[in-house]
Amino acid sequence: MEEKLSTLCSVLSKDQPVLIQTHDFPDHDALGAAYALLKLLESYGYKVEIAYGGHIQSLSLIEFVEYLDCPLLKLDEIDDLKKYQVVIVDGSPFKGTVKKVGGILKAVIDHHPARMQSTAAYTDIRAEIGACSSIIWSYWKESGKEYDEMTATAMIAGIQLDTAFLSRSVNKLDLDAYYELYFKSDVQKTYQMIKTTINICDLEEIGRAFTDYLRIDNFLIVELSEDYSRAILSVVADFLIWIKDISFVIVIETNGPEYKLSARSRDSKLDAGYLIQETVKDMGSGGGHAHMAGGVIDAERYCGKTAFLNAIIALARSEQGK
């Protein structure tokens, strides 16, 4: 083992189970990196599990989880916070993308700059890297071990998602990882799992989604008044974010006792995960990545689309002013 991997292993005990925890409301990169690290640590004799906070929101991500066929723990199912030693991947409690740590924090592996100094025994934060899966791939390379096709598929799916198929925030490490993984993974399967899929019966509902919206400057919010699936929220958000002069989109399903939401950003100064997490913290829970986030809101605490969007904008401007 080389320096990074050996240092990580030096802070982990084989006498205590390891919990690999993703950022809240995980995406393909978070789960792909977690799965690949699980397989690597297992090869060294560690007992490892994966956990996440929030919800798994999109249809494509559900398909990805089913493909990996790896049990996932929800953080609220963990009662004994002393049972696990925790490695957080693709997120950090020091950035705010992880609200609750599911055990004793040992390590943070991320590709987003933290908002405060890490106190973990091991920290590997590489803000210049496009995907956390690329960092975990580098651990595999350092180990000299061979990964199987499913592990390769998990990592390349993460890179595809976070770099938008190598079209944003790409580093040489991402390219090196992608090149090798391309020939060792099921690329056709990853393409199917990354592209959000919907059912034909959803088309009419999607059409109705554009009749109730509010725009303030480059921010847009849409409310959907029927019981929409999380997949449809993702499809609508993915479409709206590419409207000219729009940089931040929120889609909220306002039906039932708990409202689902999906958010997208294409401005590097507008961190969707942070903005959603902070805005909904007193009315529900949420979070995710800089470019995409999700959440749930208690219907009785929802302040309405105008107040909600204004809260997002006020927080965004205060962050930009720092």
Task: List the predicted regions and their residue ranges.
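Short amphipathic alpha-helical face segments that pack within enzyme cores
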Residues: 29-39, 131-138
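An acidic intrinsically disordered interaction segment
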Residues: 1-8, 95-103, 127-132, 136
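Hydrophobic helix-and-loop "lid/oligomerization" segment in the mid-to-C-terminal part
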Residues: 2-24, 32-62, 82-83, 164-322
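Fold-independent oxyanion-binding glycine-rich loops
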Residues: 23-24, 68, 89-92, 109-112, ...
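Anion (oxyanion) recognition and catalysis
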Residues: 42, 66, 141
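Short alpha-helices
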Residues: 111-179
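Active-site cofactor/cluster-binding pocket
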Residues: 63-66, 71-122
